[in-house]
A protein has these predicted regions:
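Glycine-centered tight turns that cap/initiate beta-strands
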Residues: 72, 143, 310-313, 361, ...
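PLP-dependent enzyme catalytic core of the Aspartate aminotransferase-like
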Residues: 1, 97, 115, 142, ...
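Conserved N-terminal alpha-helix of the aminotransferase class I/II PLP-enzyme fold
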Residues: 30, 35-87, 109-117
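Conserved PLP-enzyme active-site core in the AAT-like
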Residues: 7-16, 76-307
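N-terminal glycine-rich, Lys/His-bearing helix-loop that initiates the first secondary-structure elements
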Residues: 1-50
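Conserved small-domain helix->loop->beta segment predominantly found in fold-type I
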Residues: 268-271, 275-277, 282, 286, ...
Length: 425
């Protein structure tokens, strides 16, 4: 099936008892066992079924199947936020003494997790420029558990050469984890370009309406964990916390996502509310239609800003003179690369503040991927915790303004930008 069809139908058919067409909200904490033996079999992973909503939930299961189908994975795990998805993906395979290698240009929350939180838990993160594959490969050693990048960077809008980075990681027996939040599977399916694990903030484009937090981890099922037993003991040796299970033996190709569910999620508990899942499923059904308008509007906004005398620079890989335009064309299927763009106003940070304060239609907030157009100044919000050196590494100059272009009529978006640019002088 095509992506548009999968987004509406994958993972669910009308309920056999009630014939309900909409996915039901299973607002329950727990599930009855048929017998003592049935309960024991569920806990031993001998039979499929539900035990407790922190681990599995029928509403969440539909969303997991649907996103896995859209990405082309063997399985997925829904969690409470995009940050939980990133954290759990790493904790599934990394422990004290391990390291991961990451691009330096990242969403501010991810950078903070990598630069400050994970190191305090004994996991080192090594940063390199997103466009220097050789530098990233040189950082991989015997303790490296993963390479991490964003398919489209937030807020810089940079494009990573996914296939080249995947090849570099695989030469050392290391998986590539890709945050595909900004591109979504409508524009880019990282598994088709060598990635092994995909993470999403469902909060953004997949939910699409700024009403619910959610995250997703998707497993390609292609990485040969069992061939790298020394590098990945957490998947290849008995787990005393779960009846001595060996995940590569019990789950086969789904070993990663299996452990992600029964260890990080079960033990730390960032479970996704089934009510949030219901809202996200509603958004997901129209993802392809919305992304078409998001991208069309963003391309027009970028072209408008590029010719405006009050604008110093524009970063959007959909522009033909952008140095990463060809990469965007390759990995986004020839479509505009999503709807996140950044620019600087002549007059620096003070002019940028006047611009943001003058906006009337475009909302001042730090989310992205909403149906509504949004603007923020990352250096004073999402990346506020970074010092000047870290801001430079993250590709966030102090005059950068990030726009998340919505699905409103383009004339109204441009009119608001025009009057705000005039007010910024």
């Amino acid at each position: 099936m095509k992506l548009e069809t999968l987004a509406v139908h994958a993972g669910y058919s009308p309920d056999p008892t009630t014939k309900a067409v909409a996915v039901p909200i299973y607002q329950t904490t727990s599930y009855a066992f048929d017998s003592t033996q049935h309960g024991a079999d569920l806990f031993d992973l001998k039979v499929p079924g539900n035990i407790y909503t922190r681990i599995t939930n029928p509403t969440n299961d539909v969303l997991e199947q649907r996103v896995a189908a859209l990405e082309g994975g063997v399985g997925a795990l829904a969690v409470a936020s995009g940050m939980a998805a990133i954290t759990y993906a790493i904790q599934t395979i990394a422990e004290v003494g391990a390291n991961i290698v990451s691009t330096a240009k990242l969403y501010g929350g991810t950078y903070n997790l990598f630069a400050h939180t994970l190191p305090r838990q004994g996991i080192e993160v090594r940063f390199a420029p997103h466009d220097d594959i050789a530098a990233m490969e040189a950082m991989i050693d015997e303790n490296t558990k993963a390479v991490f990048c964003e398919s489209i960077g937030n807020p810089a809008g940079n494009i990573v050469d996914l296939q080249a980075l995947a090849d570099a990681a695989h030469r050392h027996g290391v998986p590539l984890i890709v945050d595909n939040t900004v591109a979504t599977p409508v524009l880019c399916r990282p598994f088709e370009h060598g990635a092994d694990i995909v993470v999403h903030a469902l909060t953004k484009y997949i939910g699409g309406h700024g009403n619910s937090l959610g995250g997703m981890v998707v497993d390609s099922g292609k990485f040969p964990w069992a061939e790298h037993k020394d590098r990945f003991p957490l998947l290849n040796t008995p787990d005393p916390s779960y009846h001595g299970v060996v995940y590569t033996e019990a789950f086969g190709p789904a070993a990663f996502i299996g452990r992600c569910r029964v260890v990080p999620l079960r033990n730390m508990g960032a479970a996704l509310s089934p009510f949030n899942t219901f809202l996200i499923l509603q958004g997901l059904e129209t993802l392809s239609l919305r992304m078409e308008r998001h991208c069309e509007n963003a391309q027009k906004v970028a072209e408008y800003l590029q010719q405006h005398p009050q604008v110093a620079w524009v970063k959007y890989a959909g522009l033909k003179d952008n140095p990463e335009h060809q990469l965007a064309q390759r990995y986004m299927g020839g479509k505009p690369p999503a709807a996140i763009l950044s620019f600087g106003i002549k007059g620096g940070q003070e002019a940028g503040a006047r611009f943001i304060d003058a906006l009337q239609l475009v909302l001042r907030l730090v989310n992205i991927g909403d149906a509504k157009s949004l603007a923020c100044h990352p250096a004073s919000t999402t990346h506020r915790q970074l010092d000047d050196e870290e801001l430079e590494k993250a590709g966030v100059p102090r005059d950068l303004i990030r726009l998340s272009i919505g699905i409103e009529h383009i004339d109204d978006i441009l009119a608001d930008l025009e009057q705000a640019l005039e007010a910024s002088k």
